[in-house]
Amino acid sequence: MAHQLKLLKDDFFASDQQAVAVADRYPQDVFAEHTHDFCELVIVWRGNGLHVLNDRPYRITRGDLFYIHADDKHSYASVNDLVLQNIIYCPERLKLNLDWQGAIPGFSASAGQPHWRLGSVGMAQARQVIGQLEHESSQHVSFANEMAELLFGQLVMLLNRHRYTSDSLPPTSSETLLDKLITRLAASLKSPFALDKFCDEASCSERVLRQQFRQQTGMTINQYLRQVRVCHAQYLLQHSRLLISDISTECGFEDSNYFSVVFTRETGMTPSQWRHLNSQKD
């Protein structure tokens, strides 16, 4: 078995007193599977890519938020103008008396829900705090580490306030149409999605929404939905014993032959080949 890449604190933190830092990825390149001896928050600003976290694939784009524990293994592939930021931190170095464990999923162990989403409002507020945090964490002046930790605490609480599960916006949300569209797409894994119906409900222009979606994500709406479904199929093929025909239905494909064609085109192998290859990992 090949030696797994592990990213180390000494390469990312200025000193053993520093608890928090920001690692920009403008853009994020393909990155082989790795672990860390620190933890991180990942926020995606635009573009798209394939993020595989603990053998589960996610097609990521603007607004995706991940809580990564040191022991988690993850990688990036099939990236397309993917812009994100990693807010990296060492739990054992944090000194503020906050309920870190309650606020950060998987803070003390690789558990809890790692994947969430942020709408445009949450993204704008997070970006502002991260900018301040990045500035403080790069300073070599008195109390820079303390200021950075205060800002990190603010960011963590802000994310708690604004995050939501990928397929369920809060009913009182005032998020943009693009946020609502991405959420509706995530909730359409098993059922058909009709863009014209969505636009009628939202009283918006289908053409303008298509353009806005492509500008922000680097994909068409159909490409995104298809790839989200294929990612879910990959997960089910590896981690369930469902028949391929049943997985096809679970992932919104009415015809299993068409599912096989789409899956093969997206992954380079048939569903059966994928299942056989990845079952050897478990």
Swiss-Prot record:
One GO CC annotation: cytoplasm
SMART domains noted in UniProt: HTH_ARAC (SM00342)
Domain HTH araC/xylS-type: 179-277
Keyword Repeat: yes
Protein's cellular compartments: Cytoplasm
Chief location bin: cytoplasm
InterPro entries: AraC-bd, Homeodomain-like_sf, HTH_AraC, HTH_AraC-typ_CS, RhaR_RhaS-like_N, RmlC-like_jellyroll, RmlC_Cupin_sf, Tscrpt_act_RhaR
Alphabetized UniProt keyword annotations: Activator, Cytoplasm, DNA-binding, Repeat, Rhamnose metabolism, Transcription, Transcription regulation
CDD domains: cupin_RhaR_RhaS-like_N (cd06977)
One of the GO BP terms on file: positive regulation of DNA-templated transcription
Pfam families: AraC_binding, HTH_18
Keyword Cytoplasm attached: yes
Annotated site, Interaction with sigma-70, chain positions: D246
Molecular function, one GO term: DNA-binding transcription factor activity
DNA-binding region: 196-217, 244-267
Summary of the function given for this chain in its UniProt record: Activates expression of the rhaSR operon in response to L-rhamnose.
Assembly and oligomerization: Binds DNA as a dimer.
Matching NCBIfam families: PRK13500.1, PRK13501.1, PRK13502.1
Protein name: HTH-type transcriptional activator RhaR
